[in-house]
């Protein structure tokens, strides 16, 4: 009687393992539409699965499940220089990416960007910042890199009605 119970238990465990294995083997596809820019998106599901999708390679095969975006980089070339901007969240529509079995999920990210100004004042100090928002509602960092290096802040001149420079300065990041 005990051997029979052991075989039944092993059969149930084997069927459960097989069912989980089959569920994990279903595949779907993800492709990125980043306009004329190049994109690299890192995804992670709730467990251990990670995937990296690039815009130039067509649709990439991934497991059919729900993913979360972890990092997104957009780069483009202009006059032989490579400009790059990164997104680490918040993610907008990319916060939950559902990939269905044998279907292609297209993610529209990056440009054209929406630039939203953020202005705050504390006493005599006026802080001007901006938010860079992509097509999926993803929020990018407020700075870009050029050829892999940091850029200097933009320069500004404050002039009066006659064109006289009242103050000259340079923006700084951070």
Language-model segment annotations:
Residues 50-55:
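Short beta-strand segments within Ig-like beta-sandwich modules, predominantly Fibronectin type-III
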Residues 5-9, 13, 19-45, 68-174:
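Primarily secretory-pathway and cell-envelope proteins
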Residues 58, 62-70:
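A glycine-anchored, Pro-Gly-centered beta-turn/N-cap motif
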Residues 56-59, 172-174:
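A short, sequence-level motif marking secondary-structure junctions
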Residues 1-2:
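N-terminal secretory signal peptides that target proteins for export/translocation
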């Amino acid at each position: 009687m005990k051997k029979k119970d052991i075989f039944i238990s092993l059969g149930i465990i084997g069927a459960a393992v097989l069912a989980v294995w089959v569920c994990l083997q279903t595949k779907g596809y993800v492709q990125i539409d980043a306009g004329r820019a190049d994109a690299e998106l890192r995804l992670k599901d709730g467990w251990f699965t990670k995937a990296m999708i690039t815009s130039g390679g067509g649709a990439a095969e991934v497991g059919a499940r729900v993913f979360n975006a972890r990092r997104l980089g957009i780069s483009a070339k202009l006059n032989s220089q490579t400009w790059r901007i990164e997104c680490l969240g918040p993610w907008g529509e990319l916060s939950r990416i559902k990939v269905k079995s044998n279907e292609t999920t297209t993610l529209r990210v990056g440009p054209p960007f929406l630039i939203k100004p953020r202005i705050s004042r504390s006493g005599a100090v006026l802080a001007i910042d901006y938010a860079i928002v992509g097509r999926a509602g993803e929020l990018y960092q407020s700075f870009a890199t050029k050829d892999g290096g940091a850029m200097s802040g933009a320069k500004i001149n404050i002039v009066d009605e006659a064109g006289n420079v009242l103050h000259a300065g340079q923006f700084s990041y951070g």
